[in-house]
Amino acid sequence: MILSKPNYIKIYGHRGARGDLPENTLESFKYLFKNNINAYETDILISKDLIPVITHDFRLDPSFTKDNEGNWITDENIIIFDLSYDELLKFDVGSLNKLSRYGRRFVNQKTLENQKIPKLSELLELSSKNKSENLLINLEIKSTPDEENLTPTPEEMVKLVMKEVNKSNLQNKIIISSFDWRTLTEIKNLYPEISRAYLSFQQQAGIKIKNTIYNRSPWMSYLPFFEKYELPKIIKSQGGKALHPYHKDITKKLVDISHQE
């Protein structure tokens, strides 16, 4: 939700257009633009040689990743940050194993041969060709305070990402989000002109995802937590542009507070 525009709704492509085409591939983003969807969310990690790349998970996902011989990978612990970009190019992420849990979820996703994990620079170059005034790019920086050696430091990640953003001249079209608010603190301190969105997850019964919202949480960059549903006040105090909560955490009270702020 964009706090300053309570009646504002925008249609986004999530990880490109993963319902129809392989997620986070250049072809998926091209497909969005061809269908007049001019806003998207995507994910950024860093390769071993410090190149920002477009991929969601810290590790290669066996459900849609094949090796250079065309076989599904079986190793679930191939860390993106352990591989150079040239090594990442050996993998094909253009098809979906329909027997996997992910594959059963997106049964209509088409296969595209020889799809590689793109660089952030490639995606921004593609996006710069979209002259729509409604272009909006949500870059989620994937970072975690809970596990070391999956990424550079938050400051290093932010500088690497912003180097590419500044080259693109798309600064006014970009909002940067993260569950790891340490990265957003770095953006605030180093690049205050860039819009920031704060991702959150509040524990729900029966869902095995770690809660990121609690007093002095490392996910929240150790900011004090006011009250359970007053995240908008915390974000406003940081000069943030938006709250991006887990969809099942959205309540009327949360929306009302957001609009008041």
Name each model-derived stretch.
Residues M1-E261:
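Phosphate-group recognition and catalysis centered on beta-loop-alpha active-site segments
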